Design a protein with these regions (language model features):
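Extended alpha-helical surfaces
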Residues: 1-192
C-alpha cells in the first residue's frame, strides 16, 4: 500500500466551519505530481454528486459512499412520510446503519434549511473522522481529506456576505441596464 508521508504531512488542518484553505480543484492539481496516477484518478472521481464507487476502489471510499447512500435513503423516507408519499422511487440500495434514523430526524428538525444542511454536514464530517482513524499516511487519508474539503467548499457557499455581495453586484447590473434601456427607449425630444 502506497504511503504519502510528505503530502499528508504538508496538508493544512481542516476544521468544520472554517473556510477551505484552497479549492478542491487546486488541491487535485497539486496532488497530481505526488500521487500514483490510479490514486489521483480515484481522488478526482470522488464527489458527493456521484456516490458510485467501483469494485477495487479504496475501502474508505466504498464505506463512506455506502453510509452516505443510507443517510440519503433515510432522509428520503422521513421527508416522504411528512408529505404523505411513498419513499420507494427515491431509494437506492444501501445497507442498514444503526442510529441513522435518529441522525436524520435530528437534522431534519434543526430548523431552517441552512441549519438542516449544516447539521447533516456536521454528521458527515464526524463519519469521515471515524473512517479515517488509522489511515495514517495512505490513500484513505487523502480520500477523507478530499471529502472534507468538498464539504468546506459547499458550506462556504452558504455565507451570507457572499450572498449579499452577489446580490448587490447583480442589482447594480440590473439598474445599469434598466437606465440604459430607459435612455434608449426615450423619444429624442425628451433628451433635449
Amino acid at each position: 500500500m502506497t504511503q504519502y508521508y510528505y503530502l499528508v504531512a504538508s496538508l493544512p488542518l481542516l476544521l468544520f466551519g472554517d473556510p477551505p484553505p484552497f479549492g478542491s480543484r487546486a488541491w487535485l492539481d497539486a496532488c497530481r505530481e505526488q500521487v500514483a496516477e490510479s490514486d489521483h484518478a480515484l481522488l478526482a472521481r470522488i464527489s458527493f454528486a456521484a456516490l458510485t464507487p467501483r469494485p477495487g476502489d479504496h475501502e474508505l471510499w466504498r464505506a463512506y459512499a455506502s453510509w452516505e447512500t443510507a443517510l440519503r435513503d433515510e432522509l428520503a423516507v422521513q421527508r416522504a412520510q411528512k408529505l404523505g408519499l411513498g419513499p420507494d422511487p427515491f431509494l437506492r440500495e444501501a445497507p442498514f446503519y444503526v442510529g441513522l434514523a435518529a441522525v436524520a430526524k435530528e437534522a431534519l428538525n434543526a430548523g431552517t434549511p441552512k441549519a438542516v444542511e449544516m447539521a447533516l454536514d456536521r454528521r458527515r464530517w464526524s463519519r469521515l473522522e471515524e473512517l479515517e482513524t488509522g489511515t495514517q499516511f495512505g490513500l484513505g487519508r487523502l480520500i477523507a481529506y478530499r471529502l472534507k474539503l468538498l464539504l468546506l467548499e459547499r458550506n462556504y457557499r452558504f455565507r451570507p456576505e457572499a450572498g449579499i455581495g452577489a446580490f448587490t453586484e447583480e442589482y447594480a447590473r440590473v439598474m445599469e441596464n434598466a437606465a440604459a434601456w430607459t435612455r434608449a427607449a426615450a423619444p429624442p425630444s425628451a433628451m433635449e
